[in-house]
Swiss-Prot record:
Any GO BP annotation: histidyl-tRNA aminoacylation
Keyword Nucleotidyltransferase set for record: no
Pathway: Amino-acid biosynthesis; L-histidine biosynthesis; L-histidine from 5-phospho-alpha-D-ribose 1-diphosphate: step 1/9
Entries under InterPro entries matching the protein: aa-tRNA-synth_II/BPL/LPL, HisRS-like_core, HisRS/HisZ, HisZ
GO molecular function: histidine-tRNA ligase activity
Gene3D superfamilies reported for this sequence: Bira Bifunctional Protein, Domain 2 (3.30.930.10)
UniProt keyword list: Amino-acid biosynthesis, Cytoplasm, Histidine biosynthesis
Family classification: Belongs to the class-II aminoacyl-tRNA synthetase family. HisZ subfamily.
Pfam hit, one: tRNA-synt_His
Role description: Required for the first step of histidine biosynthesis. May allow the feedback regulation of ATP phosphoribosyltransferase activity by histidine.
Cell location: Cytoplasm
Protein name, UniProt field: ATP phosphoribosyltransferase regulatory subunit
HAMAP family named in the record: HisZ
Amino acid sequence: MQTWQLPEHIADVLPTNARQLESAREQLLALFRVHGYELVQPPLMEYAHSLLTHIDAGLSLKTILVTDRLSGRQLGIRADITPQVARIDAHLLSANQGINRLCYAGPVLHAQPDGLLNMREPLQAGAEMYGFADIRGDIELIDLMLKSMKIADMGKVLLSLGHIGIFRALSDAAHLDAGQSATLLALMQDKDTGAVEAQVKAWKLDGMWAKAFSLLPRLYGGREVLSDARGRLPDLSAVGGALGELQAVCDAFPDCEIHIDLSELRVDNYHTGLLYAAYAADFHDAVARGGRYDGLGGYFGRARPATGFSFDLRSFIGRLPAIERQPAVLVDAEDAEAAHEAVEALREQGQCVVIDYGIGHNVSEELAGRLKKTDGVWQVVKR
């Protein structure tokens, strides 16, 4: 194997793309900041038991584990920043009993890629709100997610909505155990209506519940799905509440194209209620995902309402605006010492100044000029 080879689904980011990513990252954090979201920077590595919450079993398949040479304990390299932010809210920011608005942008590492076209080292960016259970919190985060997609130059975005509360309400009413719920969740994700019908029949569920579960995979489409669901699903207060939340989101974004899928349930995840995602042209999967995950912080000692979204900024490279390198001022190597004060003054003003050693350079072809001493004063002479 060549020494320059990298592992599968791992890649370097070269200067042109690095400028794009850093510019987008700065703009996103600025956007989050003016909406009241404070930046946190959790560590890349933690004790495994802190990263691998019992709530999301699927996270263990993504997490790379190592042994700490200092303590002998098992460490994990984070595969998702959200559990870390939940820990911060629950423990380090526990003095605040009100709302915590937090954001982040940092690398995560996956033991295996999410798909054939995905990288194993995403640059995960996102925003989260803790301590507010009202649907208005979700609407605020969805609005922020859509604004983030504008910065990423995504063009027209489709907003996809779901709600795991509907499935859970039906499961509770039908007295399904955890194993049965997990089985149905997997079948729902596959949109295998025939398999769902066969499974509920095999369990000999009451006709009303069997019909409701068989109906869920068919309840997808535009905003009209909500009125259809109200007329066909069992009259349960939790179901009505979930449909009401979905309606509130639809009303909040009248000009946005919305797709509703009541069988979009995200197997093996920590979400508890409303689910939302953004889709854009030329992407094989959602460009951003979010939802409500009330109680996640309970694993760390403080269960609170929570909602938020995240996305892999690195996956947007093909769509991010090009950021040209700043034209540089060259200074001949033999003049560098004498021109030191002038060089530093230019750099303090934000001007790129490069010492020319006479063997070529990697600066932009468009040079701002060359620093020369004219009439006793160091000046930038245009070419």
